[in-house]
Swiss-Prot record:
Organism taxonomic ancestry: Eukaryota, Viridiplantae, Streptophyta, Embryophyta, Tracheophyta
Protein family per UniProt: Belongs to the ATPase alpha/beta chains family.
Site (Required for activity): S363
Record note on quaternary structure: F-type ATPases have 2 components, CF(1) - the catalytic core - and CF(0) - the membrane proton channel. CF(1) has five subunits: alpha(3), beta(3), gamma(1), delta(1), epsilon(1). CF(0) has four main subunits: a, b, b' and c.
Subcellular location: Plastid, Chloroplast thylakoid membrane
Superkingdom of origin: Eukaryota
GO-annotated biological processes: proton motive force-driven ATP synthesis
Binding site for ATP: G170, D171, R172, Q173, T174, G175, K176, T177
Organism field: Sorghum bicolor
Name of protein: ATP synthase subunit alpha, chloroplastic
GO molecular function per UniProt: ADP binding; ATP binding; proton-transporting ATP synthase activity, rotational mechanism
Predominant localisation class: plastid
Enzyme class: translocase
Gene giving rise to this polypeptide: atpA
Topology relative to the membrane: Peripheral membrane protein
Length: 507
């Protein structure tokens, strides 16, 4: 029989007592009473904040949205299939936040700022709250710098400035995403950081956009935040705020940023789904009462900061989808009232082959010519009025049997102006080439050409101008003004091209 050695037992006990570290902590714990459809009901979380992150025993995270007298309504950031009734839930004491850094440029991430492009983890030392207050009135200054989209129709007649919020609205399949992605492509070399937020879209559509960015070299200055159609409603609801937090990080570091929300209709639908499951009272179109606040607190974060804060900017281009052109629906009217203007895309124009299918007559920018360079103001000042008059005259001409010579000339000019506004996708034009194009149309140089020849003529003119008159681009880019010298150079180039073009047509 083995003898007990008291001294050894004594030694072991002493070592264990010395190593014992007593930790006393208070944790806010609750229990799951109901779970399903991305929602969990919890009892026992007595001191929880609205919007606080909670952690379930099996690792899923959630956000506390409904604080009721008997229970707390949690929206889950995952499928929650392993959460069981009666399991423990711990409040973290933190509001949702994401890591931020320059390393996010060129990456595709989800609403929790986790990479989903298979290129490894992203190193970040700083973090920002997903929802942070918008800059106040004193922190801002008025919008005065242009943000060039590369699309003639927008830059000449519906100009967008850095720090503006311009809504892109239209039916499905009218080219809304194309307008937004072309704007991102045009920021190459402009020192603008772009954030593209895809909400509730097909994975194939997002992959196509990312591929375009890679091919055109735009991913170097772009971050893509994507939550697909199969993502939980909570993550689709959070994605725009994640994108805004990343854009704000660069804005407060004295940089210019552009953020695209594609599209806010899907975010509103995700929020409606969450609210109805949380048993919040439905309002118009079954949306909850605070759906306006959902979008206003997001879009108000776009701003042009004053000189004390570094003059950084965040330009927002939210996209909203309409049903059969109905802009008087709840979400479209809400977002129209929040933004500084809207670009309407028309299905009729799209089907008629006018692309981008921008209805210039009812599109508006509330910043106006403050967001244009002087050269553009000089050449494009009356083009919107001319196009509006053309549309009116065209409608009248359908019923009139005979038109006078002036009206016929106006119709001919209008058709050519409409033709020069057409642009192929992923082909944004620099502002110098836009100025030359608009001048050619508004001064009547295209009147002698057939409508089918306009596109070919303008393409050749822009190439001829670049090759033989490089001083023109230098004058516009340096002085931002359409000087007499620039006009002389452009007139020479147009005359030379008209002669060359007529010879080509004859042969």
């Amino acid at each position: 029989m083995a003898t007990l050695r008291v001294d050894e037992i004594n030694k072991i006990l002493r070592e264990r007592i010395e190593q014992y570290n007593r930790k006393v902590g208070i944790e806010n714990i609750g229990r799951v009473v109901q779970v399903g459809d991305g929602i969990a009901r919890i009892i026992g979380l007595g001191e929880i904040m609205s919007g606080e992150l909670v952690e379930f025993a099996e690792g899923t995270r959630g956000i506390a949205l409904n604080l009721e007298s008997k229970n707390v309504g949690i929206v889950l950031m995952g499928d929650g299939l392993m959460i069981q009734e009666g399991s423990f839930v711990k409040a973290t004491g933190r509001i949702a936040q994401i890591p931020v850094s320059e390393a996010y440029l060129g990456r595709v991430i989800n609403a929790l700022a986790k990479p989903i492009d298979g290129r490894g983890e992203i190193v970040a030392s700083e973090s920002r709250l997903i929802e942070s207050p918008a800059p106040g009135i004193i922190s801002r200054r008025s919008v005065y710098e242009p943000l060039q989209t590369g699309l003639i129709a927008i830059d000449s007649m519906i100009p967008i400035g850095r720090g503006q919020r311009e809504l892109i609205i239209g039916d499905r399949q009218t080219g809304k995403t194309a307008v937004a992605t072309d704007t991102i492509l045009n920021q190459k070399g402009q020192d603008v950081i772009c954030v593209y937020v895809a909400i509730g879209q097909r994975a194939s559509s997002v992959a196509q956009v990312v591929t375009t960015f890679h091919e055109e070299g735009a991913m170097e200055y772009t971050i893509v935040v994507a939550e697909m159609a199969d993502s939980p409603a909570t993550l689709q609801y959070l994605a725009p705020y994640t994108g805004a937090a990343l854009a704000e990080y660069f804005m407060y570091r004295e940089r210019h940023t552009l953020i695209i929300y594609d599209d806010l209709s899907k975010q509103a639908q995700a929020y409606r789904q969450m609210s109805l499951l949380l048993r919040r009272p439905p309002g118009r179109e079954a949306y909850p009462g605070d759906v306006f606040y959902l979008h206003s607190r997001l879009l108000e974060r776009a701003a042009k900061l004053n000189s004390l804060l570094g003059e950084g900017s965040m330009t927002a281009l939210p996209i909203v989808e309409t049903q059969s052109g109905d802009v008087s629906a709840y979400i479209p009217t809400n977002v129209i009232s929040i933004t500084d203007g809207q670009i309407f895309l028309s299905a009729d124009l799209f089907n008629a082959g006018i692309r981008p299918a921008i209805n210039v007559g009812i599109s508006v920018s509330r910043v106006g010519s403050a967001a244009q360079i002087k050269a553009m103001k000089q050449v494009a000042g009356k083009s919107k009025l001319e196009l509006a008059q053309f549309a009116e005259l065209q409608a009248f001409a359908q019923f009139a049997s005979a038109l006078d010579k002036t009206s016929q000339n106006q119709l001919a000019r209008g058709r050519r102006l409409r033709e020069l506004l057409k642009q192929s996708q992923s082909n944004p034009l620099p502002v110098e080439e836009q100025v030359a194009t608009i001048y050619t149309g508004t001064r009547g140089y295209l009147d002698s050409l057939e409508i089918e020849q306009v596109k070919k003529f303008l393409d050749e003119l822009r190439k001829h101008l670049k090759d033989t008159k490089p001083q023109f681009q230098e004058i516009i880019s340096s002085s931002k003004t359409f000087t007499e010298q620039a006009e002389t150079l452009l007139k020479e180039a147009i005359q030379e091209q008209l002669e060359r073009f007529s010879l080509q047509e004859q042969t």
